[in-house]
Amino acid sequence: MTIDPSLIRNFSIVAHIDHGKSTLADRLIQVTGGLTQREMKEQVLDNMELERERGITIKAQTVRLDYTAKDGKTYVLNLIDTPGHVDFAYEVNRSLAACEGSLLVVDASQGVEAQTLANVYQAIEVNHEIVPVLNKIDLPAAEPERVKEQIEDVIGLDASDAVMISAKTGLGIEDVLEAVVTRLPPPAAGDPNGPLKAMLVDSWYDPYLGVICLVRVIEGTLKKGMKVRLMGTGATYPVDGVGVFRPKKEAIDSLGPGELGYLNASIKQVRDARVGDTVTDDRRPADKALTGYKPAQPVVFCGLFPVDSAEFEDLREAIERLALNDASFSYEMETSAALGFGFRCGFLGLLHLEVIRERLEREYNIELITTAPSVVYRLHMNDGSEIDLHNPADMPDPVKIDTIAEPWIKATILVPDEYLGGVLKLCQDRRGNQVELTYAGNRALVVYELPLNEVVFDFYDRLKSISKGYASFDYQWIEDRVGDLVRMSILVNDEPVDALSMVVHRARAELRGRAMCEKLKELIPRHMFKIPIQAALGGRIVARETLSALRKDVTAKCYGGDASRKRKLLDKQKAGKKKMRQFGKVEIPQEAFIAALKMDDN
């Protein structure tokens, strides 16, 4: 039995972090009876422990709700809950492509934020009908009229008939459901008997069933027992089962045009089920694939090393497991003289990096050292070839390099105007070019072009502290640009420490180098001989600190007598220290690495 597409509504909820979209999803599930009172818990759709704890949504989730509207018809509503954070923009992108409309949730006390903007523009790009919803109107600080004006000024959406709700108390939830049914369009009616065409929206790994794929059927019918082909990879799989989430899994016979559901087909790895791929019938394939998805490109790279080198195998297993579930995370093995065996991993951004690191530490109990995050540099060599550099330690001889290009981003920052000066100074310090500056009410919208290298380090933390937490920030990649970049090595006791080398802009090398040397001077324990700590660009030392030696007071036993006696003892000690320094090894403790990599810019 296929459902009449005019009774289906596929919609997603877009919002900035903490504006209450997961709570709204909970209420919608509760009102339509998706779960009994007893099974309800906060943030039903955020399954990952980390998601609940940080209150952020990382993986997109879906749920199918049956709702009997005021016109007496029963509608099938497919809700896709999307993440709100920049790093997971690819999750948002593909969730939106599977829907026809969006609910734009804005906190009535906070107003429009940078990520609200970013996600709304993505929804507009895929031609969504958008219904504004003002949440948290039960708060004393709520100013719905001001926020409506803001939505109209900043985003340009008509907010006169925005739905007023409080997801926490359940106020206005019925109005949201009515708005979904009346104001959002149904999916385009596909032919249920045509060749199967379905878009793969998401995929994750289930330890019992293999990979489970979330699909949105465009044309044809997806049934249990048929053989499907993924058009991107060409691989074929028998369908073991199809079903829907309400939010618990429920098997059904078939999925028709416009419907969203899951299929499991003994696929071994999430990498085989590429998001955005087209699923079709192997016997009667569709002529051409749906307009595809760009695979997510990792932007930030860093090394992950186990604190205890005996845990390397456990780390490998944990990383492989995480990669099963996260196709945008890439990894390869690497070794470091200072840290031993580990992995060089690619992430979508800093939050993604932090989330993965926390999951490794928490779900697999592995203590990790993370090296300084770096971006991918494109090296144009003198012989005309191009190299992508993921790790600053692998940089070839500078003589052979013609130019080095680094990725630039366009950053959109929304900030209350009293903090604007500090934010502009921060962007200027980070080699930014101002693109525009506009005001919406008492908030300034600043758009800057910045090198990603400068943002990766700690831009977000600095931005938050300058603006006392009020600024919101969102970025997208624009292009690679050639810059005057050099590799800076850190030498401890004349030995280069590979884990601390980094690529910096020549103008800021001395500053960065000096800060690093000072930091290491505090962190490395004193030895029996003096240790020079230097920052070098090629053969030129740009900064130096000296860690003085621990020494015994050798002249304590001399009372009076000849000065040459004292001199002899001091010279003997000096000769000993010199010999010691030749053969001595400096042990840099792991805490020193970790702290040095968290270096801030002041």
Swiss-Prot record:
NCBIfam families, alphabetized: lepA (TIGR01393), small_GTP (TIGR00231)
SUPFAM superfamilies for this protein: EF-G C-terminal domain-like (SSF54980), P-loop containing nucleoside triphosphate hydrolases (SSF52540)
Similarity field: Belongs to the TRAFAC class translation factor GTPase superfamily. Classic translation factor GTPase family. LepA subfamily.
Record-level GO BP terms: positive regulation of translation
InterPro entries (UniProt xref): EF-4, EFG_III/V, EFG_V-like, EFTu-like_2, G_TR_CS, LepA_C_sf, LepA_CTD, LepA_IV
Catalytic activity from the UniProt record: GTP + H2O = GDP + phosphate + H(+)
One Gene Ontology molecular-function label: guanosine tetraphosphate binding
EC number: 3.6.5.n1
CDD domains for the chain: EF4_II, EF4_III, LepA, lepA_C
Keywords: Cell inner membrane, Cell membrane, GTP-binding, Hydrolase, Membrane, Nucleotide-binding, Protein biosynthesis
Residues noted as binding GTP in the record, renumbered to the chain: 18-23, 135-138
Name of the molecule in the record: Elongation factor 4
Cystine connections: none
Gene: lepA
Superkingdom field: Bacteria
HAMAP family, per database record: LepA
General function of this protein: Required for accurate and efficient protein synthesis under certain stress conditions. May act as a fidelity factor of the translation reaction, by catalyzing a one-codon backward translocation of tRNAs on improperly translocated ribosomes. Back-translocation proceeds from a post-translocation (POST) complex to a pre-translocation (PRE) complex, thus giving elongation factor G a second chance to translocate the tRNAs correctly. Binds to ribosomes in a GTP-dependent manner.
Bilayer topology: Peripheral membrane protein
Domain tr-type G: 6-188
Entry GO terms, CC: plasma membrane
Pfam family, one: GTP_EFTU_D2
Coiled-coil blocks: none
Chief location bin: membrane
Enzyme's top EC category: hydrolase
Compartments (UniProt record): Cell inner membrane
